[in-house]
Structures are given as C-alpha cells and as structure tokens.
C-alpha cells in the first residue's frame, strides 16, 4: 500500500503544481501501471524532459511513491524562430519572420509571459501574460496587447494589376478570464479597447478610415491534432465573438456591432497513408477591418492577397498521401496531394469606393508535393483559380488560413 505521494528534485517548478496533476487514490492499492500513467500525465504538461518515479519504504510497512521530474536543461525561458516564404517565381513574392519568447514559471502559481514579433509582409506584435489562479489551477487571468500592420491591394475586374495599395493597422488591448482544459484547449471571456485604421499607400486619392471602440469578447481554442502540418487524428477549433459597444470613426455608424472569426479543421483517414484534412473559416471584421484571400491553399493559383474585404467565407479539402516508404533514401516524410478550395470575401470599405469586386464565390484546386523537413514543411504547388489565373508556387512554413 502507498501511504504518501511525493515530488522531489525540483528547482523552478512548484512541486504542489505537480501534485495537483497526479490522480492517485492512496486509500487503495497503487500498481506500477498506475504510477507510470501518472508520470505520463505529468510529462504531458510540457514542463519536464522526463518523469522517473520510484517506490521507497514508508511507515508501518507501507511505501512512498516518489516522482522526480527532470526539469528542462534549457530552462523555462524559451526563444523560438519561425516564419514563411511564398513565391510564384514571378511577381508575387512574400515572406514573414517570426520571433517568439516565452518566459515560464515566473511565480509559484506558474505565471507565463509570452511575446511575439513578426516582420515581413505582415507586421505584428503580441504580448500576453498567462496567470493561473492558484497552484495547479485551471482558471487564469490574461492581460493581452497586440498590434498588426497588413497590406492589401485593390483590383478592378479581372485585372492582375492593382490600381491601389493600402494597409490596415489594428491595435487591441484587453483583460481576459479563462479556463484551461488539460491537453485540450481553453475558453476565455474579457473586455478591452481597439483602434483600427485603413491608410493609403498608393492611389489616385488619399483615403483614410478610422474606427475605435471598447468591447467584450468570448473566445475558445481547442487543438488535439497529432501533427501541426500533416495531421492524421484529432481536431482543431478556434473561434471568437466580439461585441463593440460604441464604434466611433470616419465611416459613420457600422452595419453591425458584432465581429466574429471561426476556424476549424478535422482530418479524415482515407487509408493507411492517405488523409483528407477538411477545414473552413468564416469571419466578419469591423468596418475598418480587412481579410485577404489568394495564394497557396487560399484560392491557389491567385496571387497572394488578390481579393480583400471585411467579410470572409472559405472552405478547403486537402488530401495528402505519404510516399516516404518509396523514397526512404531522403530520410524525411514526403507527401503527394491535392486540394479543392472555395471562398469569397466581400463588403470591403475600400472596394466599395469603385464597387464591390469581392462578392462572387471563387473555386480553386491544386496539386502539390511536400516534405516535412527539419526546417519546417515545404511545398511545391501547381494551383488554379478557375476562371482567373494559374501559378506554380513554392511555400515554406506552417500553413496560414
């Protein structure tokens, strides 16, 4: 019989947090399999390299179960580098570089500060502090501030040459209260303030639009996919609904005070080595918001950002077949696949200046070869937006929606 469960050897992580993770009833006999399962649960929290355990003699003929997790040798201040590159080998070439820093275990309750900077086609800054409310607590507070700068072009009809270049700038700050579901996801609710602007880069006239408001927001994120790039199991859901109390700006009263964005994906196994990833996205921004569509797997065959508007609907079926067994000499996963995509963006503040160019549904398809390399996934994609354009595009990085 086990009389006590202990956690030993920790320097940074709070032992009480680990104990709160362990689901073992010491009133009943504890088997080696139960202890091993508890060790796996501790490891799955992501704080340790390994979680060895042992049984030691206890009082009155009992035993003491001792977990001795091995803290990460790199510590809990992590710096990560990423990004993406997209090129059609002609006029459409974009890149983004992402640098993120996470500083964990800043206090006994497991406070974590995350900062992210992105440079390139889209410029972005994010800073948030995740503070659990208690040792091993699932409730948390999270102050958050973000800024994003994103360009978009204005096209007329079927022309591939933009008649104007613009950018959106959005600043947002808020405080959120949420609940964490272990190894599943989180939900949160909060309030804050945002400021959004559209500015002209090049156009026949200098157009400027602004909007700002306080808001309340409900957000949810769940992710059980077994792989970030080529999943076979699990699901992904990310959604938010935001109500703006009193939007003020240069456009006048908005059509709606509600903003939302929903993204979802689920892989379906079609065979031992073949998977269909079904995904979709729907969104409505503020009157001074903007979504871009065009580029790899986002109406393939069209230039990056070919279509824009403040309303978006998009669906995609992405099939990939693992051919690594027939190409073992490359020593990395190789996939052959194809996609079918359908989407539309509409109701753009700028496009309405010359008439909405983004209303029709557009369909696209692609064939591609991909590899999940140690530098990240790489794709060579032959795409076609039906009735519009075609392209051969190289893409490196995690897929964007």
Please provide the spans of the model-predicted regions.
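Second-shell loop/turn segments in exported
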Residues: 3-8, 23-29, 85-88, 113-116, ...
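Gram-negative/organellar outer-membrane beta-barrel architecture
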Residues: 32-33, 37-41, 47-225, 296-300, ...
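Structured segments of extracytoplasmic/periplasmic soluble domains
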Residues: 8, 21-27, 38-45, 104
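C-terminal outer-membrane beta-barrel translocator/porin domains of Gram-negative envelope proteins
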Residues: 78-88, 204-206, 213-342, 346-348, ...
């Amino acid at each position: 019989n086990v009389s006590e469960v202990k956690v030993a050897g920790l320097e940074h992580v709070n032992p009480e947090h680990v104990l709160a993770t362990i689901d073992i009833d010491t009133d009943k006999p504890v088997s080696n399999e139960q202890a091993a399962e508890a060790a796996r649960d501790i490891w799955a929290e992501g704080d340790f390299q390994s979680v060895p355990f042992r049984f030691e003699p206890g009082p009155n003929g009992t035993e003491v179960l001792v977990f001795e997790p091995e803290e990460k040798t790199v510590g809990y201040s992590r710096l990560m580098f990423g990004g993406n590159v997209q090129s059609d080998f002609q006029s459409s070439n974009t890149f983004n570089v992402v640098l993120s820093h996470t500083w964990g275990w800043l206090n006994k309750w497991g406070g974590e500060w995350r900062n992210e900077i992105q440079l390139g086609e889209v410029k972005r800054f994010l800073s948030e502090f995740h503070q659990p409310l208690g040792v091993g607590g699932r409730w948390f507070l999270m102050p958050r501030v973000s800024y994003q700068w994103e360009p978009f072009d204005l096209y007329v009809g079927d022309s591939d040459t933009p008649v104007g270049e613009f950018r959106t700038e959005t600043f947002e700050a808020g405080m959120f209260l949420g609940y964490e579901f272990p190894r599943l996801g989180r939900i949160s609710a909060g309030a804050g303030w945002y400021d959004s602007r559209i500015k002209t880069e090049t156009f026949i006239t200098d157009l400027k639009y602004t909007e700002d408001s306080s808001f309340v927001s409900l957000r949810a994120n769940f992710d059980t996919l077994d792989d970030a790039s080529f999943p076979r199991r699990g699901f992904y859901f990310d959604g938010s609904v935001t109500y703006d109390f009193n939007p003020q700006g240069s456009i006048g009263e908005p059509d709606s005070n509600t903003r939302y964005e929903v993204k979802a994906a689920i892989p379906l196994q079609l065979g031992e080595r073949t998977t269909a990833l079904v995904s979709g996205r729907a969104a409505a921004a503020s009157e001074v918001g903007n979504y871009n569509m065009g580029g790899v797997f986002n109406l393939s065959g069209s230039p990056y950002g070919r279509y824009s508007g403040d309303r978006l609907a998009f669906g995609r079926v992405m099939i990939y077949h693992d051919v690594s067994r027939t190409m073992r000499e490359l020593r990395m996963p190789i996939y052959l696949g194809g996609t079918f995509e359908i989407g539309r963006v509409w109701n753009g503040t700028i496009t309405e200046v010359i008439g909405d160019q983004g209303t029709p549904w557009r369909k696209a398809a692609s064939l591609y070869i991909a590899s999940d390399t140690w530098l990240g996934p790489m794709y060579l994609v032959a795409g076609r937006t039906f009735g519009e354009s075609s392209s051969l595009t190289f893409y490196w990085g995690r897929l964007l929606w």
